[in-house]
Regions:
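Short, charged alpha-helical interaction segments and adjacent helix-coil junctions
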Residues: 75-80, 173, 180-310
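Extended serine/threonine-enriched, polar tracts that run as long, contiguous segments within proteins
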Residues: 150-173, 180-181
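A residue-level signal for conserved active-site and pocket-lining positions in enzyme catalytic cores
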Residues: 28, 118, 156, 202, ...
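Accessory alpha/beta interaction modules
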Residues: 1-152, 162-164
Length: 310
């Protein structure tokens, strides 16, 4: 094991950002799309009863820190270790709940303040784009400068982050390097991280020597759970892909069978048309030779009307 613990774990993430206000303020200002006059200056952590209720699975795989600043804006910071398709909807739901909770029954709506949900995702979920940073908010479809300032959702795909490609937003790069480069195998932190006061403080908090045996057991338990979840997710993914492949083969076989049926039907129609034409030719010759209509109908199977029309 190295010198530090991994900052993405439940224990460490909450210790760094859930117990040190200056560090979560720095993180929020670095990662959220805030203008200079919107920067976070001070925060208070949410009381325990205000934090969204979690299922056991969510408790084990989602790490969150929730707070409110001096302007009464709400902030929900989450680390999602394993991606699920329902995650974005759950983020929207929890942010909406935080927004609604600001208003008492019959309250004044113009006092409502925006809610920011900052979500770090440890897996790539938007596979068709290269960007690691995704910002969602309420904007006019045509006039994008027209905004409803209510919910702001940010998703950061950690595995897509490449620090060498960014020259601006220094603190954003430093915090993302902190979250992606520091693991429990790290023997020495990069100099750029140690030189920054906030990140250096966060690194100090991650040093293994600062944790009790009980905390280390909780840390190991967290990663054991994440490992099991990844194994289960990979197994499910493989089974889904296998099922999709089998369905594709079955669909192809059905398509071939349908094509053969259509071909057989077409051949049957052609044969039927040939027989019909043969009967018509026979009827025409019989009619020319003066056979009675009734006799022609009996021999060819044509109707009286069809024979009279020849």
């Amino acid at each position: 094991m190295g010198k530090y613990l991994d900052p993405r774990a439940d224990l460490t993430f909450k210790k760094v950002f859930g117990e040190h206000k200056n560090l979560v303020i720095s993180l929020l200002n670095a990662l959220l799309p805030l203008k200079d006059d919107e920067r976070v200056e001070s925060i208070e952590y949410w009381p325990a009863e205000k934090i969204p209720k979690r299922t056991q699975v969510e408790k084990d795989s989602i790490v969150d820190v929730c707070c409110k600043d001096n302007k009464n804006r709400e902030f929900i910071v989450e680390m999602q270790m394993t991606w699920t398709e329902s995650f974005k909807k759950r983020v929207l739901l929890n942010a909406s709940k935080a927004y609604v909770a600001q208003s008492e029954a019959g309250g004044v709506y113009d006092t409502l303040q925006p809610v920011y949900a900052l979500n770090f995702v440890n897996e790539n979920f938007m596979k068709d784009v290269d960007d690691y940073y995704h910002y969602y908010h309420l904007v006019h479809d045509k006039y994008t400068d027209k905004v409803i300032d209510g919910l702001h959702l940010v998703f950061v795909e950690l595995k897509k982050f490449k620090p060498q490609t960014f020259t601006e937003k220094k603190m954003q790069v430093l915090w993302l390097r902190f979250l992606t480069e520091i693991t429990d195998k790290t023997l020495e932190a990069p100099a750029e991280l140690l030189e920054n006061p906030e990140v250096s403080e966060a690194l100090k908090i991650l040093e293994i020597g600062a944790y009790s045996p009980g905390e280390m057991r909780a840390y190991d338990k967290f990663w054991d759970y994440i490992s099991r979840q990844r194994t289960i997710a990979n197994d499910i993914r493989r089974e889904v892909e296998k099922a999709k492949a089998e369905i594709a083969v079955a669909k192809a076989e059905i398509a071939v069978a349908n094509a053969k049926v259509e071909e057989a039907n077409a051949e049957a129609e052609k044969a039927k048309a040939k027989l019909k034409q043969k009967d018509i030719d026979t009827a025409r010759r019989m009619k020319a030779k003066g056979y009675a209509i009734a006799d022609i109908a009996e021999i060819t199977g044509l109707t009286v009307e069809e024979i009279e029309g020849l």
